[in-house]
């Protein structure tokens, strides 16, 4: 919501402006045009220069060749206009129809135009252009825009009498903001990051109240689970689309080429002419080319009952296969052409899901298939020429809501059937041997070259088609007529003249047209059935080679039929993958083991019910402490334990809805919602008093007592599915559509030697690595590449088969909910039994013995405290921890000490330590730390080749994310350590998937980063999931999760930091400039931007800083300080270096200058310095900056930071923000609006 812009009344005496009343006569609706103004005092040239040189980036109009582009921001939009997002990225191509008028946004270009008109004393035009009613409104709009959109405006247009808040949102809106009007979706767009559509095809024609409401609906899509909110799809930078309407009159239209298409005596005649014909024609235009046609002769509107989606992609594939297989496919050719022509418009996947006419695709793919799979030709009868075909393509590309008339459709059939009929070796033109033409102009002397030129210049096509047409254009041969079947007429053919057909060819075309181009899921279904061998990419190539590509004209024998592939094709042809989710009513519920909740279960369930943050006295509060001190209060930026009754009683009583909150493992919620409250300092659930940190009253044990053994059939079925060998498609479909009436114990009946444990691992991981309890298999695109999520290229299809099996075994737990995906219910007995069964398979083995490593270096107190905390939590059943201690606090040594402790105390089947690094740079650091501080570790480097040999009890493997992705190590680790864990934020990356697998199968996990959560919550979400806290990974539980699973220590001994603040002074001139901005009536955000610009860019300020910095360095030198001085930029570093005679890193001297960019991360050779001199940095960078000095090799225990700030300026606000960044629990970024406020107004941060 935009803020109301307020304005102080200017008390200066207003001077009247001479206005010519004649200039005002054209706009009688203006209320206040004759009011006196002070425009004569305005220096418009200066104001225009201000806009030209100091407009903020988002308020600058987008131009091309010095002309404004046709986007909504520049032009606005009228009702029924269509707009499309043409910016590359995840929302590319999404389009809408505008249902309410939108004003053009106020950009630098528009404001300059208004100012130039005012300079000419033209007052009427600005009011008309901006649709304003008075000069007072104009002053308000201009003044407020200049205040907010520029950095050096001098308040010269502040003479308005009152505020007009109804214009505030318009004034502040920029091109990246969502449209605030009703829209109708017209294009589903193409997600260039995933290869899928932006929104589903069935959203077409859906109406939304605004861009924001459409974005909110997008956020609910399965493909956006775990992703940041949609914000930049339906926005003002969308391009206004030209209306592809038919033109009735071209008398005054410029063109270079004019074609006419006529249907005369049952034959289509296309000609390039020089003069416009007088007969009534309709026209479509492409740049310098116009095509005339009689609409009623060639096109007719599609019937309204034709809206049911048809699989046009499948029909187009069938059209191509019909031509490739030759003359005995005439029957299916006719049927296919009829089906395509009758189909509604659809979204073309290979062209970014662009909305296209099915009739256009009919003639376009016919044109391409004839050239690619047959040969160019000249006509000899009533068949269409290549020029006829491409002109029909261009007409239907503009006229989307039409289909071909029956007469013209008959000619299209004849043309396709003639190409199909010409199926000998001599009918396959070898276009591949030709060279691509660089230029492809229209050639009036050659219809053939003209057709190809029109195609290349005006049709969006696949790159392979482009290359083919450019090669074909270079051909200068005399082409032959098509051979014709015998008929009574020498010239005219009908489709009925093509009578050759046989059932085998018909069936072959019907099935081979179902391939990876139109049905990408076929890749995963095929992979599900064959032994583990081919990746999805290899299967894509295989299907093309074995099934799709065969052309009878090659003279080669058709490949033997792959029976597995044929069965999958039959399945896709005849059966829907949708199944009934009705569960067998006779399914048995088992009696349960009444398992007593352990401490972790009790605490977790309580935190789910009571643990979300609330407010008391303006402070953040959590019921996440200890039994003695149950509440945590955020006081002075630090969480403090308390038992204050007033704070505890302030808990807001409320319902907790548990329907979508997963219970602790082994239990289910007894109800879908619970009433929680605190009465007299005691927690109550549904009116019953419970102990602090024991929410087990809301839980019911669901661990089933299963005694029934698995029969031989089911054992054989499970073994087959998990073996990695052949699975019959019929078996997969059978288990998909059936369910066992009861849970059976199946693990002990199968032989581990007969199953592929990698499939078990991947199945186990899929169950945990899901969002909103939806298990997603694939999808992949037609080339076998991933789309929305990371996939296992070798096993993804097998996983689809296995989850169908699990649905059969646990029908109340896993259910198919789409062609590939499955829903998961974790509050069932089946879920508990399934997880325990998989774990029984995975975690088998003998207890580990062997050498135990030791730590040879004494730990700092905070390191020992961290180790003790983690070990205690691990003992209580926790899986993962995050170590967010400061840079230089020794996190590496802490993790090694933890590893040694765990190895010493645990000797079960888990063994070895895996260290995952983001890249190669940290490998040497880890090797050095192990050598310096430990004994008896068996250190192994995971080399790119993969194998690391035997993993012993004391083995520590150092690997990188990339190596783990390419050559994963399958092992049950005792501990996985992920250093710089921000590298596993992207859930769609395969390396993140592998990191998740390693951590899930490990007994324990530690994730390390001093800037652990410096990121958006959607990125944080995946790392929280890896920790497996048992708490909901939702924003309202964020602080609770952190309190439970993050340690953040600052060394309490050893190196100590002393911080001093030196105040530099502004001189009188710069102080006056500063105060002038302070006095402006601006939002604090805009004011901060202007003040910052002054302090950064003003030369007088920069020179003054250099002088005072020189004195500071001289004084510090006398005190024995060796200074590392941080500059904002390279330019500032050079300025300081030249004036202070101090080298810039990597050169070093008694002092050294480094930029924030170069000197924040990774530099380990600066420990010769003991003092940091800098302006207050951002909280994100401070820990890393301090870590350049406070690290091994530093000989000084007393280190210093000398902050220099300009007194009574916004730089003091930076100091206040740093107060909340000394420890991790303080390191949440201050809300930006609050930061601006404290910086500008010097308020104390609360």
Curated annotation (Swiss-Prot):
It is an enzyme of class 3 (hydrolase). SMART domains: DEXDc. InterPro entries: Helicase/UvrB_N, Helicase_ATP-bd, P-loop_NTPase, SNF2_RAD54_helicase_repair. GO terms for molecular function: ATP binding; DNA binding; helicase activity; hydrolase activity. It comes from Acanthamoeba polyphaga mimivirus (APMV). The keyword ATP-binding applies. Signal peptide: none annotated. ATP binds at residues 885-892. Residues 872-1030 form the Helicase ATP-binding domain. Its EC number is 3.6.4.-. This is Putative helicase L115. Pfam families: ResIII (PF04851). Residues 1-21 are annotated as: Disordered. Keywords: ATP-binding, Helicase, Hydrolase, Nucleotide-binding.
